[in-house]
């Protein structure tokens, strides 16, 4: 692939989601309706690379303080309903999402109900009746990471078998 892998320096900078949208508008004239600001739009995700480079001289940016409505019911929230999680953006592409997980039975049941979930997740919720320690988790986009690391132009070319909205089997 004739690419040089550069080991990044740490710590990676972090910004609140609301602050990112504010800076994208002020610096680059990027504006979206308030209804879209509960997550990063695809274009906002791309622009975070420029923002991270301009502001922090970093290819990486942790995005924090997402509102709960767009995330999984098992992500822990603070007293204001803000998730205790993050997205990690590298070169304008989300490569991982992580969060502290909810471990308190009453809270996770309430969160599941808010999302309209019921019997289909009962088996999962039952684990928490017996006590669960505080914990966290993350999911990494290995195909996206491979694409960026090797300079491959499309994630379709970085996967063994591409699956997408219109193609689920080989």
Task: Identify the function of each model-found stretch.
Residues 99-100, 104-170:
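Active-site pocket scaffolds in enzymes
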Residues 95:
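Conserved phosphate-interacting/catalytic interface
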Residues 1-91, 113-114, 119-126, 131-132:
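Metal-assisted phosphate- and nucleotidyl-transfer catalytic regions
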